[in-house]
Amino acid sequence: MAETFKHTTVLLDEAVNGLSIRSNGIYIDGTFGRGGHSRLILSHLGPEGRLLAIDRDPQAVEVANTIDDARFSIIHGPFSELAEYVEARGLTGKIDGILLDLGVSSPQLDDPERGFSFMRDGPLDMRMDPTRGQSAADWLMKAEADDIAWVLKTFGEERFAKRIARAIVERNRIDPLTRTKALAELIAAASPIREKYKHPATRSFQAIRIYINSELEEIERALDGALTVLAPGGRLSVISFHSLEDRIVKRFIRQHSRGPQVPAGLPLTEAQLRSQGGPTLKSVGKMMPPDDEVADNPRARSSVLRFAERLPS
């Protein structure tokens, strides 16, 4: 098994409690990670309960395979395909709760060989599943400066995106970037102003990681899938770690809590209005980590937990 890196699960009890677990229910942990949420869910389930876990990181799947529990199964793949996994098992509309813990995990950040961190030197990879897709180094080598700048601005809200993108392209023409430390140093040198208490490469590394892993598109597909597979009364519990993620989750819950929006003045009969359907979700709440959790685990600082409940169709 790969080297073990510590992972402290954020909002562990709160996220699981928000699922209102029934002992014989069927649940999905869409982001197994190192199994913190999964193990707690299993502790609430009775003999007839079931937990389906998903993770696209092979190292996470290795850990999951050590769980010897007939109620538990693990799928190696992206959580965006959860509706397909559920349909293949004949469980569409029967899922009692889904938990998604978004973003990169501590073991992924802490392992320099994964290439996620600007604080530790390693290969410039950043793939959550190293067996699929192109690495960050490969993409940066092929991409145009305008495309890199767009990614840095869109997914990292990096104010010096164009300057950094030009520096990356110029460097790759001479000496290709293959290590995280080299990229972090280049970004720092290209950034004329530094934010207090924040490394100048923070936003760019986040942006490149999000792009390489299609993270925002994955979230959108996973949320759509969750709505399809949840049973009436089923719960959705989602932890996000930055504003781009949380914005998607917040918008999704709000949109489906309102139901179809019919333009004012559109000449529809009452029957036609009813045929448009009503809301399919109910917002159940939002939580932030308590101060003591942030003190123990600084990575929890920016986390937001949102809950929703599936309404009958």
Curated annotation (Swiss-Prot):
Which transformation does this protein catalyse, written as a reaction?
Answer: cytidine(1402) in 16S rRNA + S-adenosyl-L-methionine = N(4)-methylcytidine(1402) in 16S rRNA + S-adenosyl-L-homocysteine + H(+)
Q: What is its EC class?
A: transferase
Entry's localization field: Cytoplasm
Q: Where do the annotations place S-adenosyl-L-methionine binding?
A: G35, G36, H37, D55, F79, D101, Q108
In short, the EC number is 2.1.1.199
User: GO molecular function terms here?
Assistant: rRNA (cytosine-N4-)-methyltransferase activity
Q: Quick one: where's region Disordered?
A: 276-300
- Membrane-crossing ranges are none
**One annotated Gene Ontology cellular component of this protein:** cytoplasm
Q: Write out the GO biological process terms.
A: rRNA base methylation
Q: Which UniProt keywords apply?
A: Cytoplasm, Methyltransferase, rRNA processing, S-adenosyl-L-methionine, Transferase
- Function summary: Specifically methylates the N4 position of cytidine in position 1402 (C1402) of 16S rRNA.
User: What family is this protein classified in?
Assistant: Belongs to the methyltransferase superfamily. RsmH family.
Q: What name goes with this protein?
A: Ribosomal RNA small subunit methyltransferase H
Name of the gene this protein is made from: rsmH
